[in-house]
Amino acid sequence: MDKSLKANCIGEFLGTALLIFFGVGCVAALKVAGASFGLWEISIMWGMGVALAVYATAGLSGAHLNPAVTIALWKFACFDGKKVIPYIISQMLGAFFAAALVYALYRNVFIDYETVHNIVRGTQESLSLAGTFSTYPHPSLSIGGAFAVEFVITAILMALIMALTDDGNGVPRGPLAPLLIGILIAVIGGAMGPLTGFAMNPARDFGPKFFAYLAGWGELALTGGREIPYFIVPMVAPVLGALAGAWLYKKAIGGNLPCNCGCE
C-alpha cells in the first residue's frame, strides 16, 4: 500500500469511527443510561457527529465515511476505482471498533440494565438493546418496505451531498459544506428515522451490527428477528440509492449547470 493510500485509509477509519462513537454513544445513553433524548436530539447528534468527522478527516481522505458514497463517487464523480475496496474496508473497521469502544465504556450499564429488566441477549426481547449499535425497521414495515425507505433516503442524501459540494451549483459552500451535510442527515433522521433508523450507510450499520453479533446478541443482531436477514437491507439499499441519487443529480442538475466540465 503506497503512503498516500495509507493516509486515505487512516482518514476513513478515523472519520467513520468518530461518527459511530458519537452516534452510537448517544443511542446508548438513551437506551440504557436513562438520558432524555427525543428523535430530533438523536438526529442532531448523528448529524453533528458526521459533520465533525468530516471536518476532522476531509484533508486526509475526502471524508466519504460511507461505502455507498464511495461507490457513487467512483461511478459518477471520477473517484479512483483502485481506492474503493480499501476505503470500504477502512470504513467497516472504523465502525466496528467505535461500536466496541462505546460498548466497553457502557459495559457495566448494559449489564445492570439487562439484570434489572431480566433481558437475555440473543432473545427477541433483547433486540431493542441490539438496536443501540445498528438499525432495525419499525415492526409494521416489511423487508421490502424497509428497503424502499433506505433506497429513497440514501438517494436524497447522495443527491444533496453532490449539490452541496458542487461549487458550480450556486454559491460555493466551502467550509460550510460539512455542517450543511450534517444538518441534512439530521433532517432526514427527524423525518424518516422512526421507519428504519436512517442507516443510509453500510459501514455505519454492518460494522456495529457485527460487533453486536460477537458481543452476545448472536444471529438476532444480523437477522433482526426476520425470516430474511435484515442486515442485507442496509448493506444493499443505500448503495443502490446512492447510485440513483448521484445519477439523478448529474442528469437533472449537474449536467445542466453552465460551468459543469465533467471529469478531467
From Swiss-Prot:
Known catalytic reactions: glycerol(in) = glycerol(out)
Gene: glpF
Entry protein name: Glycerol uptake facilitator protein
Annotated GO MF terms: glycerol channel activity
Location(s) in or outside the cell: Cell inner membrane
GO biological process entries: glycerol transmembrane transport
Residue positions of motif NPA 1: 66-68
Main location: membrane
UniProt keyword Secreted, yes or no: no
Note on domains (UniProt): Aquaporins contain two tandem repeats each containing three membrane-spanning domains and a pore-forming loop with the signature motif Asn-Pro-Ala (NPA).
Keyword Repeat listed: yes
Stated role: Mediates glycerol diffusion across the cytoplasmic membrane via a pore-type mechanism.
Annotated InterPro entries: Aquaporin-like, MIP, MIP/Aquaporin, MIP_CS
Ranges within the bilayer without spanning: 62-65, 66-76, 197-200, 201-214
Protein family: Belongs to the MIP/aquaporin (TC 1.A.8) family.
A GO-annotated cellular component: plasma membrane
Intervals, Cytoplasmic compartment: 1-3, 59-61, 77-82, 168-175, 253-264
Keywords: Cell inner membrane, Cell membrane, Membrane, Repeat, Transmembrane, Transmembrane helix, Transport
Cystine residue pairs: none
Motif (NPA 2): 201-203
Periplasmic-side segments: 33-37, 107-141, 193-196, 215-229
Segments crossing the lipid bilayer: 4-32, 38-58, 83-106, 142-167, 176-192, 230-252
PROSITE patterns: MIP
Protein's membrane topology: Multi-pass membrane protein
Pfam families: MIP
